[in-house]
Amino acid sequence: MASLVPLKEKKLMEVKLGELPSWIMMRDFTPSGIAGAFRRGYDRYYNKYINVRKGSISGISMVLAAYVVFSYCISYKELKHERRRKYH
């Protein structure tokens, strides 16, 4: 049975594997579309973890942990070479 929701309006987790290539081609890959996607993601994160009634440190600590992991991954190449040095 065909889905009642058009393919363009489906979320990624609702798309079947056979529909995935056509769903990807329907996405907006212009700079404004990509900026809009990042904006929606930021708004979703902000409303879920930061802008809550009983807020805690968890939302900000997740961002901080992601920053630490990301910066470690970026500087891993230099850290790998420093690990083998004995004196300098």
UniProtKB/Swiss-Prot annotation:
Top-level lineage group: Eukaryota
Functional note: Subunit f, of the mitochondrial membrane ATP synthase complex (F(1)F(0) ATP synthase or Complex V) that produces ATP from ADP in the presence of a proton gradient across the membrane which is generated by electron transport complexes of the respiratory chain. ATP synthase complex consist of a soluble F(1) head domain - the catalytic core - and a membrane F(1) domain - the membrane proton channel. These two domains are linked by a central stalk rotating inside the F(1) region and a stationary peripheral stalk.
A Gene Ontology BP annotation from the UniProt entry: proton motive force-driven mitochondrial ATP synthesis
GO cellular component, one term: mitochondrial inner membrane
Modification N6-acetyllysine, positions: 16
Protein name as catalogued: ATP synthase F(0) complex subunit f, mitochondrial
Intracellular or extracellular location(s): Mitochondrion; Mitochondrion inner membrane
Similarity section: Belongs to the ATPase F chain family.
Disulfide linkage: none
KW Transport (keyword) present: yes
Subunit structure: Component of the ATP synthase complex composed at least of ATP5F1A/subunit alpha, ATP5F1B/subunit beta, ATP5MC1/subunit c (homooctomer), MT-ATP6/subunit a, MT-ATP8/subunit 8, ATP5ME/subunit e, ATP5MF/subunit f, ATP5MG/subunit g, ATP5MK/subunit k, ATP5MJ/subunit j, ATP5F1C/subunit gamma, ATP5F1D/subunit delta, ATP5F1E/subunit epsilon, ATP5PF/subunit F6, ATP5PB/subunit b, ATP5PD/subunit d, ATP5PO/subunit OSCP.
Matches recorded under Pfam families: WRW
Species assigned in the record: Mus musculus (Mouse)
Residues with the N-acetylalanine modification: 2
A GO MF label: proton-transporting ATP synthase activity, rotational mechanism
Alphabetical keyword list: Acetylation, ATP synthesis, CF(0), Hydrogen ion transport, Ion transport, Membrane, Mitochondrion, Mitochondrion inner membrane, Phosphoprotein, Transmembrane, Transmembrane helix, Transport
Membrane disposition: Single-pass membrane protein
The keyword Transport is annotated on this UniProt entry: yes
